[in-house]
Curated annotation (Swiss-Prot):
It catalyses: chlorophyllide a + oxidized 2[4Fe-4S]-[ferredoxin] + 2 ADP + 2 phosphate = protochlorophyllide a + reduced 2[4Fe-4S]-[ferredoxin] + 2 ATP + 2 H2O. Gene3D superfamilies: P-loop containing nucleotide triphosphate hydrolases. This is Light-independent protochlorophyllide reductase iron-sulfur ATP-binding protein. It comes from Rhodobacter capsulatus (strain ATCC BAA-309 / NBRC 16581 / SB1003). It holds the Pfam family Fer4_NifH.
Amino acid sequence: MSPRDDIPDLKGFDGDGEGSVQVHDSEDIGLDVGGARVFSVYGKGGIGKSTTSSNLSAAFSLLGKRVLQIGCDPKHDSTFTLTGRLQETVIDILKQVNFHPEELRPEDYVTEGFNGVMCVEAGGPPAGTGCGGYVVGQTVKLLKQHHLLEDTDVVVFDVLGDVVCGGFAAPLQHADRALIVTANDFDSIYAMNRIIAAVQAKSVNYKVRLAGCVANRSRETNEVDRYCEAANFKRIAHMPDLDSIRRSRLKKRTLFEMDDAEDVVMARAEYIRLAETLWRSTGEPGLTPEPLTDRHIFELLGFD
């Protein structure tokens, strides 16, 4: 028995063949997001993508947008600062109904979070087994079946680590813009360079374009800015390494629910500005950076 056998194809949809959901074209999936603007958030593992995604979703909602955030990580902690709890995953809920999606209602797997942000956690198979990308693909199908992607202004995909192969690249097939979360250090920038290459490859056949990067948990931005200048890329936000952001995670809240300390107010303003920048970016030509070779990055940022 394959480790993936515990996650069968969703009944009620055309069969795709084992594992094929993760590499299908968007036309095959038939995803219709209506007029929603779709953003995929990528970055090195542990860089703060979920914190960035949740506060970005909150900022969009405060700008009057209807927002849906989709966590694409087996840890299923993408949305807990929006909802105040760890949300049950789509895959676990499907198991409860023996993988009969027609028995589910949106409220069975969608939780309303801060300021009306709708939250979904795709989940994933146990560690070391199955295909997480397959789970993401099936979640997208379920959202399509219930027309949830059509009834929003903004969709935010919070994607696992810096994995941009197969299924975890699937959000790029539907995204208008990809946002990369990085930090002012070599490893984070190295991961960003590889993500840029993956997004550029997808952009040949899909509408996705790069929006820019966020320098996160960083006092300075000099290394990020040096890379951006060399690769013709752009930093569009800077989130310093603030203790208030760490405390908000511990309190299971977005920054917009914290007390009005000076650093909190500053961070909120930066997230609002980021949301406004991303919203405008979909009506403008996307960035077209040139990813650097490994040797070039080492020479640019590595040790002397």
